[in-house]
From Swiss-Prot:
Enzyme Commission number, as recorded: 4.2.3.5
GO cellular component: cytosol
Protein function: This reaction introduces a second double bond into the aromatic ring system.
Species per Swiss-Prot/TrEMBL record: Streptococcus equi subsp. zooepidemicus (strain H70)
InterPro entries, A to Z: Chorismate_synth (IPR000453), Chorismate_synth_AroC_sf (IPR035904), Chorismate_synthase_CS (IPR020541)
Name under which the protein is recorded: Chorismate synthase
Keyword presence, Lyase: yes
Family indicated by similarity: Belongs to the chorismate synthase family.
A single GO molecular function term of this UniProt record: chorismate synthase activity
């Protein structure tokens, strides 16, 4: 499985082509749209979410509600594009139009300046448009397709916010996966402790008044995977490494960890490793899951627990100082439309990005031309692991 996305923040549309999805998978635009709606929710989202109501169009690879094994083409129209027809025109335009929304005041923390340097842009909008988090809408759409495959194999995914703008969420110890998923999806903050919602919302509102933004830490959990996905034989085949790269590819994500993560640096080995146990009915398992479901780049059969840290959104309504790229004079950075926080939406993006990596790994490890062969091979392997 592989895919590419294309499109700009204020361009005509976002597009993706996905190759490698097995034939015979039940798939509809409505299934994908449900996931896109999750991305657009969450407390703290701004005006664009009222402008855009993302709906995907499938133009290839699906016939009569079933995938054909051919490349799947997805398109999401940008409704906001109608206000940017001349500025984002594909055809050549007059110089006066080019100057309309030209950006020469790069925003600290964004791709504006470095992208302009790399690609020799005199208008930094070219870097801004493609590097925008708007692109993550299409990665959620791709992830939605991947999650349909995972569901057929009995694999579930969830995400929730652990730290919201410096406020740690009190997660009940040993909270079951199903409870985490249910609680987070019921919360417009994507947290599992409803008692903290009022405090966090007040914090968001105050930060918004100050023209500032908030970051945080998000946890994604994958439940139902067997032991042995991934490999230790080469560095680039380690599944946790692939997930780490994917998480860090999400806009504004600056760190990733599995299980106990960086806390392991403060512990002894006996406080970190997951003891192995065996039972005649359930096979091998672990007493704990401190390593987050991975050993040597391979799944252990425990839930995958991966955390990502998202920096505060760098577009500030109280902008930081910058420099005009034409005059080199100090200026306050350009202000583009932004939100005080996008953590709940980022959690949906992270969940779908991780789901895509997991699906890709499964499709590479098992026969995957069609869903019948995939399911037979996958469940046969799960049975083998169970009786090892």
């Amino acid at each position: 499985m592989r895919y590419l996305t294309a499109g700009e923040s204020h361009g005509q549309a976002l597009t993706a082509i996905i190759e490698g999805i097995p034939a015979g998978l039940t798939l509809s635009a409505e299934l994908i749209n449900k996931e896109l709606k999750r991305r657009q929710g969450g407390y703290g989202r701004g005006a664009r979410m009222r402008i855009e109501s993302d709906r995907v169009h499938i133009s290839s690879g699906v016939r009569h509600g079933k995938t054909t094994g051919a490349p799947i083409t997805l398109t999401i129209q940008n409704k906001d594009h109608q206000k940017w027809l001349d500025i984002m025109a594909v055809e050549a335009v007059e110089e006066q139009i080019k100057l309309k929304r030209k950006i020469t005041h790069p925003r600290p923390g964004h791709a504006d300046l470095v992208g302009g340097i790399k690609y020799r842009f005199d208008d930094l909008r070219n870097a801004l448009e493609r590097s925008s988090a708007r692109e993550t809408a299409m990665r959620v759409a791709v992830g939605a397709v991947a999650k349909v495959v995972l569901t057929e194999l009995g694999i579930e995914t969830a995400n929730h916010v652990l730290v919201f703008g410096g406020i740690e969420v009190a997660v009940p110890e040993a909270m079951p996966f199903t409870d985490i998923k249910k609680a987070a999806e019921a919360s417009d903050l994507s947290i599992v402790n409803p008692k903290q919602e009022a405090t966090i919302k007040a914090h968001i509102d105050q930060v918004k008044k100050e023209g500032d933004t908030l970051g945080g830490i998000i946890e994604t959990i994958i439940h139902g995977l067997p032991a042995g996905l991934g490999s230790y034989v080469q560095w680039d085949r380690k599944l946790d490494a692939k997930i780490a790269q994917a998480v860090l590819s999400i806009n504004a994500f600056k760190g990733v960890e599995f299980g106990m993560g960086f806390d392991m640096g403060y512990q002894k080995g006996s406080q970190v490793m997951d003891e192995i146990i065996w039972h005649e009915t359930s096979g091998y398992s672990r007493r704990t899951n401190r390593l987050g479901g991975f050993e040597a780049g391979m799944t252990t059969g425990q839930p995958i627990v991966v955390k990502g840290v998202m920096k505060p959104i760098p577009t500030l309504y109280k902008p930081l100082m910058s420099v005009d790229t034409e005059t080199h004079e100090p200026y306050k950075a350009t202000v583009e439309r932004s939100d005080p926080t996008a953590l709940p939406a980022a959690g949906v993006v992270m969940e779908n990005v991780v789901a895509t990596v997991i699906t890709k790994e499964i499709l590479e490890q098992f026969p995957s031309d069609n869903m019948t062969d995939l399911k037979q091979a996958f469940f046969a392997y799960c049975d083998y692991v169970h009786h090892f």
